[in-house]
Amino acid sequence: MKHITELFATVAHRVKPPVLIAVGPPWPVANLVKTLALPETDVTCAQFDLHQTDRVRETLAEVETKAEVVTVADLWDLPPRFNTVIFPASAQADRELKLDIVEQGAHVLAVGGLFLTLSEYERDSQFAKLQKKIFGKCGETPSSENGMAFFSTKTEESGARRRHEVKYHAKIGAGAPMEFVSRPGTFSYGRFDAGSRAMLEVTEINPGDSVLDLGCGNGAVGCLAGAMAGPEGRVTFIDSSLRAMALAELNAKANGATNARFVNATRLQGLEGGTFDVILANPPYYAKSEITRLFIEGARDLLKPGGRYYLVTKMPTAVMPLIFDTFGDCSVIENRGYSVVLAGAIGA
């Protein structure tokens, strides 16, 4: 969103504090805060993910401006006190998440407040439809190389809250099927991830094992792994997303996970070393990312002696050097078009 400040300039006169910047990438958010030039107490930046929250704070410091930065599972966890909600909508966000943010943003607007979407698309017909559906009317700026802005006024109190959640079932082998709730903006939305299935089908989990679901998303992997570990086993779910963690707790409870622990953290804080028999990782496919490095390097010291580390990927050549550097050795199991890398237990 490199033209966000130019796009915002076309609608800046409509903005009244206090302002909420709803999600959005760190640099566009920071540039908006700087452009607004409001007192720190008049601007709140909300994110769903602790890692993104940290990045927003770092970026605000880099551009030498300040705002309140909060992490929430849902925008409507905030009070309905804002006169303007700004949604810097990146092209990468999926339609369901965009709809979710617009609907939840309406709930935190005061009556008479303005909802403003900044889209980086030169021609965008999606937000006009979304905002008309929610607010009744929607104005827009002309199409331009800077993108388009869409603006709507909240004319009455919001109705009932509506979640854009999708339920699905999954099972591994002869295990019992489980039902999972998924929501936009979390891993494995709408269906059980094929890579996770490929990994669990070849994972060795014994009764009584202590399992870590690393980057758990909605908790489906941890719940299915916990069933394999049995009632004497233990599952720890960890994710940097508050929205994902809320879902993991919901799904674990619904599927009878009685010996479960839930950790919201960005860098595996709160996990004791040498405590896990099995660690399961399904990192983002941009394999050289900071998250993937953390998933690999941070896992080694968490394993018990003889513990097993599994990572599923479609790009094994991209992660193998880092896994070799971290664990010293590994093997690869091919399943369903995915490569499941096993490390930690080699030679044990």
Each predicted region: which residue ranges?
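Conserved beta-strand signature within the Rossmann-like core of class I S-adenosyl-L-methionine
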Residues: 112-120, 306-313
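SAM-dependent Rossmann-like transferase core, predominantly class I methyltransferases
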Residues: 2-3, 145-210
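Short SAM/SAH-binding signature in class I
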Residues: 82-89, 276-282, 310
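A short glycine-rich, Lys/Arg-flanked "PGG" loop and its adjoining helix->strand segment in the class I
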Residues: 99-111, 295-305
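Conserved SAM/SAH cofactor-binding pocket of Class I
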Residues: 1-64, 194-281
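Short beta->alpha hinge that forms the Motif I/post-I loop of the SAM-binding pocket
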Residues: 48, 97, 120, 239-244, ...
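Class I S-adenosylmethionine-dependent transferase superfamily signal
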Residues: 105-106, 131, 225, 299, ...
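Active-site capping/gating segments
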Residues: 134-167, 173, 321-348
